Swiss-Prot record:
It catalyses: alpha-D-glucose 1-phosphate + UTP + H(+) = UDP-alpha-D-glucose + diphosphate. CDD domains: UGPase_euk. This is UTP--glucose-1-phosphate uridylyltransferase. It comes from Bos taurus. Signal peptide: none annotated. Substrate binds at G115, G116, H223, N251, I252, D253. Gene3D superfamilies: Hexapeptide repeat proteins, Spore Coat Polysaccharide Biosynthesis Protein SpsA, Chain A. Pfam families: UDPGP (PF01704). Residues 502-503 are annotated as: Critical for end-to-end subunit interaction.
């Protein structure tokens, strides 16, 4: 009789279903452990230690995944955060700046999350290398911003890129172009975890390679991995040794996430004398943000609650703009000393995000991830700061790209600011159809970016192209039905117009 069957019969005779499940769990953990050990034997000697750390990290995550079942929050315990735990930005700004700005800046490290590819916008390679404004990429703008700070205040703020195995090689190739910039640039890699078969829960990978048949067998486990991989890289200790105190973490595709001197001053000179270990920038929800994670009070601490954690019966309540008015921008300010302490105590607690995927061959897999902001509850004296919407300017689609390329924004030292010529501070709602999804197609359809200073809403669907010097105002809806094509002529001014049908402009 196999050991598994013996265990099973023993379990059944003892405590029924729960005991049975526990045995199954233990067997699964043992099977996964054996599979991971097999994979580790295929690692080349120079990658062995690094791979072992990754696989050990995955085993811990997998163990937690097997323990947790159902929504990870008890809805009855969720409360609105107390007034003083989320401060308005105006109050932080009113404290002004210190006499010596460079002294606080020299305590800062800027970390950009650079693990993502540009696939959702039809681009190969790292998303950070997509051109967003005047030929400048996300990475160019980031370097320009920090160089401007270092030159203006005679400081040494370094830039750190958290790459993934998907982006590391291409990013490193491009970094040499910044050799003469006044910014020290460091990189470290996110962990690389194995995807698991949805049915068997065993790793899909058979060896450490991530090419050939193994291309889809591995994944970067979400930005919550920053704490462990930053610590393991040795950079955390290096920066603490240099006297750095805080990291400012943000997504590289959020063009609003610039270093804010008022927030930094608040951290370095806390008004109540109690150092704040974690600041999350939040901003007011609009209808477009209803799925964003929100800050709540939970068991006496600030806690980030994501839509995936909410019991189904309460999802509509979670999306309510009146009850939960703010959402997480993923601009975070975190104490380096606190990260070191919590990492060494194994005390950083983040909910697991179970992300189902289907591989090209049709195999259903899951990947286990964590989110950087979810760790807020592990830090002491955490704070939310309700910042202006201008600090949240993510470019996820070509619709977002159209906004940041337009005359709605002006570019100065790598930072985008809303044009003073726009009469209202809100950003227009832009929805470009599937013909515009890929950057290449999008660029082909605009001879030049339209004037959008007075635009409120733009919807474009179907085969549509724009000539030079087009001006869009109010609400503009352009719909070319299947088989039709619409060419908006050069110099056209469309104000509160619906354009449909067929409009071809041919060269004479």
């Amino acid at each position: 009789m196999s050991r598994f069957v013996q265990d099973l019969s023993k379990a059944m005779s003892q405590d029924g279903a729960s005991q049975f499940q526990e045995v199954i769990r233990q067997e699964l953990e043992l099977s996964v452990k054996k599979e991971l050990e097999k994979i580790l034997t295929t690692a080349p000697s120079h990658e062995f230690e690094h791979t072992k750390k990754d696989l050990d990290g995955f085993r811990k995550l997998f163990h937690r995944f097997l323990q947790e079942k159902g929504p990870s929050v008890d809805w009855g315990k969720i409360q609105r955060p107390p007034e003083d735990s989320i401060q308005p930005y105006e109050k932080i700004k009113a404290r002004g700046l210190p006499d010596n700005v460079s002294s606080v800046l020299n305590k800062l490290v800027v970390v950009k999350l650079n693990g993502g590819l540009g696939t959702s916008m039809g681009c190969k390679g790292p998303k950070s290398l997509i051109g967003v404004r005047n030929e400048n990429t996300f990475l160019d703008l980031t370097v320009q911003q920090i160089e401007h700070l270092n030159k203006t205040y005679d400081t040494d703020v370094p830039l750190v890129l958290m790459n993934s195995f998907n982006t590391d090689e291409d990013t490193k190739k491009i970094l040499q172009k910044y050799n003469h910039c006044r910014v020290k640039i460091y990189t470290f890699n996110q962990s690389r975890y194995p995807r698991i078969n949805k049915e068997s829960l065993l790793p899909v990978a058979k060896n450490v390679s991530y090419s050939g048949e193994n291309t889809e067998a591995w994944y970067p486990p979400g930005h919550g991995d920053i704490y462990a991989s930053f610590y393991n890289s040795g950079l955390l200790d290096t920066f603490i040794g240099e006297g750095k105190e805080y990291i400012f973490v943000s997504n590289i595709d959020n063009l609003g996430a610039t270093v804010d001197l008022y927030i930094l001053n608040h951290l370095m000179n806390p008004p109540n004398g109690k150092p704040c270990e974690f600041v999350m920038e939040v901003t007011n929800k609009t209808r477009a943000d209803v799925k964003g994670g929100t800050l709540t009070q939970y068991e006496g601490k600030l806690r980030l609650v994501e839509i995936a954690q909410v019991p189904k019966a309460h999802v509509d309540e979670f999306k309510s703009v009146s009850k939960f008015k703010i959402f997480n921008t993923n601009n975070l300010w975190i104490s380096l000393a606190a990260v070191k302490r919590l990492q060494e105590q194994n005390a950083i607690d983040m909910e697991i995000i179970v992300n189902p995927k289907t591989l090209d061959g049709g195999l259903n897999v899951i990947q286990l991830e964590t989110a950087v902001g979810a760790a807020i509850k592990s830090f002491e004296n955490s704070l939310g700061i309700n910042v202006p919407r201008s600090r949240f300017l993510p470019v996820k689609t070509t619709s977002d790209l159209l906004l940041v390329m337009s005359n709605l924004y002006s570019l100065n030292a790598g930072s985008l600011t809303m044009s003073e010529k726009r009469e209202f501070p809100t950003v227009p709602l832009v929805k470009l159809g599937s013909s515009f999804t890929k950057v290449q197609d999008y660029l082909r359809r605009f001879e030049s970016i339209p004037d959008m200073l007075e635009l409120d809403h733009l919807t474009v669907s179907g085969d549509v192209t724009f000539g030079k010097n087009v001006s869009l105002k109010g609400t503009v809806i352009i719909i070319a039905n299947h088989g039709d094509r619409i060419d908006i002529p050069p110099g056209a001014v469309l104000e509160n117009k619906i354009v449909s049908g067929n409009l071809r402009i041919l060269d004479h």
